[in-house]
Design a protein with these regions (language model features):
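Hydrophobic alpha-helical membrane-interfacial segments at the cytosolic entry of transmembrane helices
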Residues: 91-106, 270-271, 296-324, 402-406
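Active-site lumenal/periplasmic loops and adjacent helix-entry segments of GT-C-fold
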Residues: 103-212
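Membrane-embedded, hydrophobic transmembrane alpha-helices
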Residues: 1-88
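Membrane-lumen/periplasm interface segments of specific transmembrane helices
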Residues: 112-115, 298-385, 410-411
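Perimembrane helix-loop-helix junctions
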Residues: 82-89, 285-312, 567
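Hydrophobic, aromatic-rich transmembrane alpha-helices
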Residues: 17-25, 183-201, 294, 369-400, ...
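Membrane-interface alpha helices of multi-pass inner-membrane proteins
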Residues: 46-50, 264-280, 286-291
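Membrane-embedded, lumen/periplasm-facing catalytic core of multi-pass transferases
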Residues: 331, 487-559
Length: 645
């Protein structure tokens, strides 16, 4: 990658970082609080332009606005010595230095990654690539994104698109960077709170940096790893980890209250909108957060909290309704394959009890694996939250209300999950993608707990009668205890850092080498054979053998051809057209090709079943041939062997 290409890829990142630094200086907030506002604003800003099918205009306008604001804020910092001094402090702050280090680390680790998993290839990786290539709304028959995937909200794909929009070529690894970057910037507020508290406590040296590093490593890497393992952030493109972290950030801001200034309200507003734009289930978190803020507010701040909650809820509902309206306009149905019905409260209760018996967290130790069920995780997290409030002399009743809100949100998520997937659960007695979906709730709770710990950890060592220091002072081994705690914190930080780096280096989306090579071979054959132009060229891909085994081969081929104006028209379930698969006859197959307006049909291989069942339309072909391409002739209702000269 030459310097020009590297700069084009990193230009949006540099723009976001510089603007956040200047914004934190102008508004007098920490960099860790400013960077989430900037990144979330990118998604919120681009969404109306995407809905209006003017994504390119929105991207250019956003870049211009950020550049103009950066120039204006820079001039202000030069003219005002107070702002200049504040900027220098922010540049030298621990949160900014940790941010720079984590960004460099993510750039290094994501450089050579490829999109490989199922949902990543057909949705979370394909969506941003389609936006980068065509810069058009991916809804309706003209979209390259499959119809079954079009109902997914475009929040994260829009962010991925902006991060790569100034590059001359699409980089798969930068998708992983964007996902990891999104998680990191949401952890920065926690890191900054810790650094502020420790500075006020006059802590210096290795302990100060150990605390900041400890919170960054635990929050950004260790917690998601415990929940998601091989399906977590930095190694996959699943949206559930970012959704859980954003939900935790949103709840933390809402519980903080809207009476302490405009920043908490703006943070809640942007994060609430982005929750709805990240995934459908984000609507539950968005509504629960503002309701929790209203329930937990005291009499003094009740009016401001109610007004702030009403504003956030209104914005969330407007965005949600606008997306539903778009889906209706383009006749895009929900990706669910069944109607949602009420099964009865007894069935729901039975389901919840069964779910409570499943494992939510797995800890792989040297000689054993410890599995912790979902209710145990909930009780541990909520118990720690209440215990933290007790020892830090915080308002215990308010903390009890917050814990109740979080518990009710988790239960509502479970019940909603049952309504959505009741068909597959009843038929197969299984819980599809349970660990990923439910992991969002656990990750949200863990974030709130870590945020509380960061806010109140100085209270744990403060001069409170119920504080830990009061207990420590009664001990004759006070000095030894404090010294052991310091060294233990440093040692734990080192171990977590090493383990986390090993996790990121070793954790990768995996695809078998034959599938990867064959997908590239199929894509190259199509590129060198079919005629392409500004209009999409539709190809029906036939793969001999079980369609489920060939799922990733189909998806990878589809993904590689997105930016080449070639669309694999059929979904993976119809790649096997023989009697062992879809069971088409020759006439039915021709009818399907014509009805789907396919320009070409490609056989990745000619098996004996394909040869015998479709010999009347294949013409001069032999068993064992690979990458055989035919042009679809709608007038003569036939397919003709095609070789581009």
């Amino acid at each position: 990658m030459d310097f020009g290409m590297f700069f084009s890829v990193c230009f949006p990142l540099l723009l976001i970082s510089v603007f956040s630094l200047l914004l934190s200086t102008a508004v007098n907030i920490g960099f860790g609080r400013a960077i989430p506002l900037t990144v979330l604003s990118v998604i919120v800003f681009l969404y109306p332009f995407y809905a209006a099918d003017s994504l390119r205009t929105g991207r250019i306008l956003l870049a211009i606005v950020l550049c103009v604001l950066c120039i204006a804020l820079t001039v202000c910092c030069i003219l005002k010595s107070e702002l200049s001094d504040r900027l220098k402090k922010h540049v030298a702050s621990t949160s900014f230095l940790i941010y720079c280090a984590l960004v460099c680390l993510l750039l290094l680790l994501s450089a050579n990654k490829f999109v490989c998993l199922w949902d990543s290839l057909r949705l979370w990786g394909a969506y941003p690539k389609a936006l980068w290539t065509y810069e058009t709304r991916q809804l309706g028959a003209d979209a390259i994104v499959y119809p079954i995937m079009q109902s997914y909200v475009p929040g994260m794909p829009l962010l991925c698109y902006f991060m790569e929009s100034f590059s001359r070529s699409f980089h798969e690894g930068f998708l992983y960077f964007t996902y990891g970057y999104f998680d990191v910037i949401l952890i920065l507020p926690v890191i900054e709170i810790v650094t502020e508290k420790t500075r006020k406590a006059a802590e210096k040296g290795y302990l100060f940096f150990a605390k900041a590093l400890f919170f960054s490593i635990v929050g950004a890497i260790v917690i998601p790893w415990l929940i998601y393992k091989n399906y977590g952030p930095y190694v996959t493109l699943y949206i559930d980890p970012p959704l859980g972290i954003l939900a935790g950030y949103y709840f933390a801001v809402c519980f903080e209250g809207f009476d302490s200034g405009k920043v908490p309200f703006v943070s809640a507003l942007l994060s609430g909108i982005c929750l709805v734009l990240l995934k459908d289930s984000g609507m539950l978190f968005a509504v629960a957060g503002v309701l929790g803020a209203a329930i937990c507010s005291d009499k003094v701040s009740l009016k401001k909290t109610m007004l702030g909650s009403a504003g956030v809820l209104t914005a969330v509902l407007v965005v949600w309704y606008s997306w539903r309206h778009l889906l209706n306009v383009y006749s895009v149905s929900n990706h669910l394959s069944h109607e949602i019905t009420h099964p009865g409260w007894s069935e729901i209760l039975r389901f919840v009890v069964n779910v409570f018996q499943l494992d939510a967290v797995e800890l792989d130790l040297v000689a054993a694996r410890i599995c912790i069920s979902f209710p145990v995780v909930l009780l541990i997290l909520l118990g720690l939250k209440l215990m933290l409030a007790y020892f830090s002399s915080y308002r215990f009743k308010r903390e009890l209300l917050e814990s109740t809100v979080m518990l009710m949100t988790a239960i509502a998520f479970l019940v909603g999950y049952y309504f959505v997937f009741q068909s597959s659960i009843n038929e197969e007695n299984d819980f599809p993608s349970y660990s990923r979906y439910l992991g969002s709730v656990i990750l949200c709770l863990m974030y709130v707990l870590e945020y509380d710990l960061a806010v109140r950890h100085s209270g744990l060592i403060g001069r409170h009668k119920k504080g830990l220091r009061g207990w420590i002072q009664t001990s004759h081994k006070k000095k030894r205890f404090i010294k052991a705690t310091k060294y233990g914190l440093v040692a734990l930080t080192v171990l977590l850092s090493v383990g986390s780096l090993l996790y990121i280096f070793r954790g990768k989306e995996k695809i078998t080498a034959p599938d990867f090579v064959q997908a590239s071979d199929i894509a190259d054959s199509l590129l060198h054979s079919v005629e392409t132009g500004d209009k999409l060229t539709d190809v029906y891909l036939c793969i001999p053998g079980d369609c489920k085994r060939n799922e990733r081969l189909h998806h990878r081929t589809y993904f590689e051809l997105i930016d080449e104006h070639i669309r694999i028209k059929n979904f993976y379930l119809t790649t096997d057209i023989t009697s062992s698969g879809s069971g088409y006859s020759s006439g039915q197959f021709i009818d399907i090709l014509i009805a789907d307006h396919c320009d070409y049909v490609m056989f990745s291989g000619i098996s004996e079943d394909i040869y015998h069942e479709f010999s009347d339309i294949l013409g001069d072909v032999s068993v064992g041939e690979s990458n055989v391409i035919y042009r679809v002739n709608a007038k003569s209702r036939s397919i003709d062997r095609f070789n581009k000269q």
